[in-house]
């Protein structure tokens, strides 16, 4: 037997018991003829005692131990003299009677502690060492608990887990596919799925009325802190449902997770139309933990000789409560923030509403106190508040104000990661128009159904058609999205035509799918939740990388295994491939 207990298990009730433990040496220290060793495993840390006066040979062996050595010990549980309230085992320690080295270790390239000295690149290269850190390990434990709870919840609601193919055909729209050459079919390729969308709809047509899958998906796109080339979805589909049925089930799932994982009772989700989300927050994934909504004020700014406002399509403001004290330096920092190329605002205008009732603005030259008071009244500012104003093309300025709003929310401590604001964003547009390519694109995907009352607009004003689509947003993060699907053959063909797909193209790409509609497709809809983002939100993480065991870096590389890598000419030849420009 290698061990009788784990390093996080023993308590004062185990006093005087003989135990066997295994684990890694976290650290050791020598003091007055005693060697103290912190032994760590997945479950916690237990302190070991090697007393020189009791057993000199054992004491000398303990002196040889280095960080991350793997050892086995036998000993007696005793009450700890200097208790450590920071760890669950802090009331006890082990007086060691036997020590066995299972494997020595080289000196790790960084300290394996919560506050490590290892940079991102180094920790990614030695990810198996980084995973020993309590912080990363606890994130993966949280992930496991969430997946387990999700499966239990969906199973209790009659969902069936069904696996769908990983090697599929490439389809248009969305991000780029990862392509896999077929050795047995020269010149032909598979792609890795961006989602199981078509297959889960086919399962509905097949009669599996409640499906789910915790599934790997792949997108060859530029990476950010909330994106990875391979990611995990909780993918679900239901037959004979309307939008409200789906929202109810998955709002229930989210409440179940908050209750079982975090012990929190979450009230009902807010509902916000896409149009109102953009109008009041400048974003289709607003953080509703705090107010500071966008207010349009252009109509009360024009005609005063300030061309910047007069010539702008949109002038919008937010009110930062209690920020009238902001200094010139702080205002300059905000100006630099909004003018950063990633945001791209032309400038920042402010109105300071002091506690004495006086008004001060960066455009005093053009606007009277009466004018400024109208702005103050419009945004609902109080004495002591600061009004921040941006201007320009409407949609771009709303996006810029959204970024400024989030920045102010962070500065004012309004985005507490222990607080949660959950909502559904609904009534998305069905299409987006690309002015460069002169064509419509699906806002979500081509299989989303239009709202019944807007179907008549498909022929005349498709840009105004709303979709039976919805996104789940928590703390300004899009956790997932879904829709009611098209289940009518003729309507699906019409949507493809509006997207510019010819009949021959539609048949070659989606023939198998639309043909299935001819054989009794039920009304159906579904949702896909991003598991990585879900876990990161629960854990309060800024990046999803810290809740994925073996993530890629921002260049899409796994520096630990060296992927992607060059393959030999022989293997390329087997696949009938030639890499252009390869010397």
From Swiss-Prot:
Keywords: Aminoacyl-tRNA synthetase, ATP-binding, Cytoplasm, Ligase, Nucleotide-binding, Protein biosynthesis. The keyword Nucleotide-binding applies. Its EC number is 6.1.1.12. It is an enzyme of class 6 (ligase). InterPro entries: Aa-tRNA-synt_II (IPR004364), aa-tRNA-synth_II (IPR006195), aa-tRNA-synth_II/BPL/LPL (IPR045864), Asp-tRNA-ligase_1 (IPR004524), Asp-tRNA-ligase_1_N (IPR047089), Asp/Asn-tRNA-synth_IIb (IPR002312), AspRS_core (IPR047090), GAD-like_sf (IPR004115). ATP binds at residues 219-221, 228, 478, 530-533. Catalyzes the attachment of L-aspartate to tRNA(Asp) in a two-step reaction: L-aspartate is first activated by ATP to form Asp-AMP and then transferred to the acceptor end of tRNA(Asp). This is Aspartate--tRNA ligase. It comes from Azobacteroides pseudotrichonymphae genomovar. CFP2. The lineage of its organism: Bacteria, Pseudomonadati, Bacteroidota, Bacteroidia, Bacteroidales.
């Amino acid at each position: 037997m290698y061990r009788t207990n784990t390093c996080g298990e023993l308590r004062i009730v185990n006093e005087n018991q003989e135990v066997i433990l295994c684990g890694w040496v976290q650290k050791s220290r020598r003091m007055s003829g005693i060697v103290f060793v912190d032994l760590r495993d997945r479950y916690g840390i237990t302190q070991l005692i090697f007393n020189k006066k009791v057993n000199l040979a054992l004491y000398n062996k303990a002196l040889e131990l280095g960080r991350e050595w793997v050892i086995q010990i036998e000993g007696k549980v005793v009450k700890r003299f200097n208790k450590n309230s920071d760890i669950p085992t802090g009331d006890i320690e082990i007086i060691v009677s036997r020590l066995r080295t299972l494997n020595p270790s080289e000196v790790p390239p960084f300290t394996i502690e919560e506050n490590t000295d290892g940079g991102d690149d180094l920790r990614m290269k030695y990810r198996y060492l980084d995973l020993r850190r309590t912080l990363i390990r606890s994130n993966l434990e949280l992930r496991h608990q969430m997946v387990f709870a999700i499966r239990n919840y969906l199973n209790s609601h009659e969902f069936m887990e069904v696996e769908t193919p990983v090697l599929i055909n490439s389809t248009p729209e969305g991000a780029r596919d990862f392509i896999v050459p077929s050795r047995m079919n020269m010149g032909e390729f598979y792609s890795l799925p961006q989602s199981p969308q078509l297959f889960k709809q086919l399962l509905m047509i097949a009669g599996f009325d409640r499906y789910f899958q915790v599934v790997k998906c792949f997108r060859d796109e530029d990476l950010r802190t909330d994106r990875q080339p391979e990611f995990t979805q909780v993918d679900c589909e239901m037959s004979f449902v309307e939008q409200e049925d789906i929202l109810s089930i998955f709002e229930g799932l989210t409440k179940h997770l908050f209750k079982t994982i975090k012990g929190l009772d979450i009230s009902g989700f807010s509902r916000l139309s896409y149009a109102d989300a953009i109008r009041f927050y400048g974003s289709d994934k607003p953080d509703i933990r705090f107010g500071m909504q966008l207010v349009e004020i252009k109509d009360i700014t024009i005609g005063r000789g300030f061309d910047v406002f007069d010539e702008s399509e949109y002038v919008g403001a937010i009110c930062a409560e209690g920020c009238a004290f902001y200094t010139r330096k702080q205002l300059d920092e905000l100006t630099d923030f909004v003018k950063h190329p990633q945001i791209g605002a032309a400038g920042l205008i402010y109105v300071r509403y002091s506690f004495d009732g006086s008004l001060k603005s960066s455009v005093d030259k053009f606007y009277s106190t009466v004018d400024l008071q109208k702005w103050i009244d419009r945004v609902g500012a109080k004495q002591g508040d600061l009004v921040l104003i941006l201007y320009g093309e409407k949609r771009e300025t709303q996006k810029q104000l959204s970024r400024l709003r989030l920045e102010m929310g962070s500065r004012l401590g309004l985005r507490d990661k222990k607080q949660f604001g959950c909502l559904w964003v609904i009534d998305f547009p069905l299409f987006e128009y690309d002015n460069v390519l002169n064509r419509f694109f699906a806002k979500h995907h081509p299989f989303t159904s239009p709202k019944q009352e807007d179907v008549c607009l498909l022929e005349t004003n498709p840009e105004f058609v709303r979709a039976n689509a919805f996104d789940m947003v928590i703390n300004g993060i899009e956790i997932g999205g879904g829709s009611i699907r098209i289940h009518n053959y003729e309507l699906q063909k019409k949507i493809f035509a509006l997207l510019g797909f010819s009949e021959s193209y539609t048949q070659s790409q989606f023939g198998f799918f639309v043909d299935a509609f001819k054989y009794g497709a039920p009304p159906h809809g579904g949702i896909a939740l991003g598991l990585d983002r879900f876990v990161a939100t629960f854990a309060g993480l800024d990046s999803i990388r810290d809740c994925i065991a073996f993530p890629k870096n921002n260049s899409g590389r796994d520096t630990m295994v060296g992927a992607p890598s060059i393959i030999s000419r022989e293997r390329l030849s087997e696949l009938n491939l030639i890499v252009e420009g390869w010397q």
